[in-house]
UniProtKB/Swiss-Prot annotation:
The RecF protein is involved in DNA metabolism; it is required for DNA replication and normal SOS inducibility. RecF binds preferentially to single-stranded, linear DNA. It also seems to bind ATP. It comes from Mycolicibacterium smegmatis (strain ATCC 700084 / mc(2)155). Pfam families: SMC_N. It is found in: Cytoplasm. This is DNA replication and repair protein RecF. PANTHER family: DNA REPLICATION AND REPAIR PROTEIN RECF (PTHR32182:SF0).
Length: 384
């Protein structure tokens, strides 16, 4: 698989650009702040419908514009697919597949498969559990695009159930049973959607564990062995020896919801469900968070991405590799290890502030990025 074309309109610093891409290695070179990362971000957005830098879509739209458009043409085993995404702040995105509108933007997931390495990856090790949950869900959705609907449904249930919890305590005090009956209905929805989400994550972690272990050994052969484990907020799920059925997870969630009912009513928040779970990262007998050195943290973050790459390759479709300024962050040995893996990929798109950040023995197409002033302010452009 490779991206043959990227077109942007009013995306970040790009007023307009049409880039013809090709298999192999391409390096986008330019000073920081000139817009090279925005190109990689656009491709990642086309693959996942999300940015690796911001949580909302509003910053993706160029200042003064009403919407941004990201267009990609992807080639997979000789077949071309064109994806057009229209991003509008505060409204649902619109999407077209091969120029035909689709009902939901989620229908384009899976057309472009990609793995992104970026400086933000350190948050996978040092950040909050939400960063690690997002990593798992993005990878699971890349492999099974239908899971995007499960995630959306679950998030909606959590929001609505939380709103109900904030009013239910007072209703119960007044003896109003109807609110509690409604809460029980939402418990069923949360357990059903949550069970599907937990099942996908637990299965993914089981498959990912050996790949992360191997990747970490490649990156840091003298360090302690790496391991990952899914940690659930529900005791019955946490104590299960391995992947279980969706029905098992649903029953466990319903039981936990019943037992935590009083605590949830008192606090007005959902205390049970996969939105409170975590991916535990360990080095030897210690958790990586709080105990790993800077170099070990980088190795673990890279191992998670390399593990994702190997897992996607095992599915039969090699993903596009996106490397956003990561070579500049790495020491010589880790840079060499990453370059070895990336060098064999079908397509690698790299950003760098200076050409010297790229491995010397890489034969790569080089694209210079510039910044110019126009009537709308500073805009990025490709040097001719």
């Amino acid at each position: 698989m490779f991206a043959r074309h990227l077109g942007l309109t009013d995306f970040r610093s790009w007023a307009r650009v049409d880039l013809d891409l090709e298999p192999g290695r391409t390096v986008f070179v330019g000073p920081n702040g000139f817009g090279k990362t925005n190109l990689v971000e656009a491709l990642w957005y086309s693959a996942t419908l999300g940015s690796h830098r911001v949580a909302t879509d509003a910053p993706l739209i160029r200042a003064g514009a009403e919407r941004a458009i990201v267009s990609t043409i992807v080639v997979n085993e000789g077949r071309e697919l064109a994806v057009d995404l229209e991003i509008t702040s505060g409204r649902a995105n619109k999407a077209r597949l091969n120029r035909s509108p689709v009902r939901s933007a989620r229908e384009i997931l899976g057309v472009l498969r990609a793995v992104l390495f970026s400086p933000e990856d350190l948050s996978l090790v040092r950040g909050d559990p939400g960063d690690r949950r997002r990593y798992l869900d993005e990878l699971a959705t890349t492999r099974r695009p239908a899971l995007a609907g499960v995630r959306a449904d679950y998030d909606k249930v959590v929001r609505q159930r939380t709103a109900l919890l904030k009013t239910a305590a007072g209703a119960r005090y007044r003896g109003d049973r109807s609110v509690i009956d409604t809460l029980e209905v939402w418990d069923g929805h949360l357990a059903a959607h949550g069970a599907a989400l937990v099942a996908s994550r637990v299965k993914l972690v089981e498959e990912l564990q050996p790949e992360v272990e191997k990747a970490y050994q490649l990156l840091a052969p003298a360090s302690r062995p790496a391991a990952i484990r899914y940690r659930s907020s529900v005791e019955a799920i946490e104590d299960a020896p391995g992947p279980e059925s969706v029905e098992f997870y649903e029953a466990a969630l319903l039981d936990a919801l019943a037992r935590r009912r009083d605590a949830e009513l008192e606090r007005g928040v959902c205390l049970v469900g996969p939105h409170r779970d975590d991916l535990e990262l360990r080095l030897g007998d210690q958790p990586a968070k709080g105990f790993a050195s800077h170099g070990e943290s980088w190795s673990m973050a890279l191992a998670l991405r390399l593990g994702a790459y190997e897992l996607l390759c095992s599915d039969g479709v090699e993903p596009v590799l996106l490397l956003d300024d990561v070579f500049a962050e790495l020491d010589t040995s880790r840079r060499r290890a990453l370059a070895t893996v990336a060098g064999s990929a079908e397509q690698v798109l790299v950003t760098a502030a200076v050409g010297e950040d790229i491995p010397e023995d890489w034969d790569a197409r080089r694209v210079e990025i510039r910044m110019v002033e126009d009537d709308g302010g500073r805009v990025s452009m490709v040097a001719s």
